[in-house]
Amino acid sequence: MQDTAIQEIQGAETLEALQAVKTKYVGKSGLVTKELGSLGKLPPEERKACGAEINVVRAAIQAALDEKESALKRAALDAKLASEAIDVTLPGLPLPAGGLHPISRVLDDLIGIYRQMGYAVIEGPEVEEEHYNFEALNVPWYHPARDLQDTFWLEDGRLLRTHTSPMQIRYMVDHEPPFKIVVRGKVYRYEATDATHEAMFHQLEGLVVGDGISMSDLKGTIAEMARGLYGASAKARFQPSYYPFVEPGADFAVYWENPRGESKWLELGGCGMVHPNVFKAVDDLREAAGKDRVYEGKTGFAFGLGLERIAMLKYGIPDIRYFYANDPRVIGQFRGELG
């Protein structure tokens, strides 16, 4: 039986065939198992010798089964590896090249310019308290921005900030002058969306406070930003304008030649000298928090600009909605320049 079983084991070409041989000989109803079960019918003096002989046969068959099973599994694995072989010398599949979003690139450029001028970069909460967004910035109750139709109000009385200026107040409450900061972040306006307006957009705002800060310092800062952003030939101009948190206030524009060779003035943002009422509001908040009043007699300037507008002008994007449409056909056009 042993020789026959081993021949059948060696002749099995698949794991299924080997399992059939195993069942035939050492399964629950196998030939060897039956022989062991019949030992009880033998005379007592013969059982021990016959049992030992059958166990030797069973062990030999099991050893042959194990060896054959290992060989068949190795062969199956080798065949699978051969069928799935990868030529590691072939070039890999190219990954699509990424690129910076136009807004990110403009922001990085501006941050780099202001860091070179010694500005610290900070961020603030997008969900803001009404006092920080309006009252502390000298925005009166009758200002249009405080209307329900122009601001996203939350049920608890807070709001989505309409500008990054609240961080001026928060920073001054926690810090004493002199300092130079720029604030970056998203702002929200409750208005209809069209080619030039979005309910959410990005701002970069600057604040400088110290002794003897003047309008000339502000103009020099804006001019330096213009040259850093648009080249050494860029020029800046200022026109009087009203903003409740600065006095005097101005709009600023940059004279720039675009990639198509067209030169014109581009309005970029607003600026001005920090209003004395803003400094007073900050000192009031500091006093309420147990801090010294340190802003009386100080001067400073602030400025703010929209990043989407700069990117639209710089890259010739006609519609602000393209920035957030997640359309790879649009953003992919800037991969070479922005990547």
From Swiss-Prot:
Its EC number is 6.1.1.20. GO terms for biological process: phenylalanyl-tRNA aminoacylation. It is found in: Cytoplasm. GO terms for molecular function: ATP binding; magnesium ion binding; phenylalanine-tRNA ligase activity; tRNA binding. Its cofactor is Mg(2+). This is Phenylalanine--tRNA ligase alpha subunit. InterPro entries: aa-tRNA-synth_II, aa-tRNA-synth_II/BPL/LPL, Phe-tRNA-synth_IIc_asu, Phe-tRNA_ligase_II_N, Phe_tRNA_ligase_alpha1_bac, Phenylalanyl-tRNA_Synthase, tRNA-bd_arm. Binds 2 magnesium ions per tetramer.
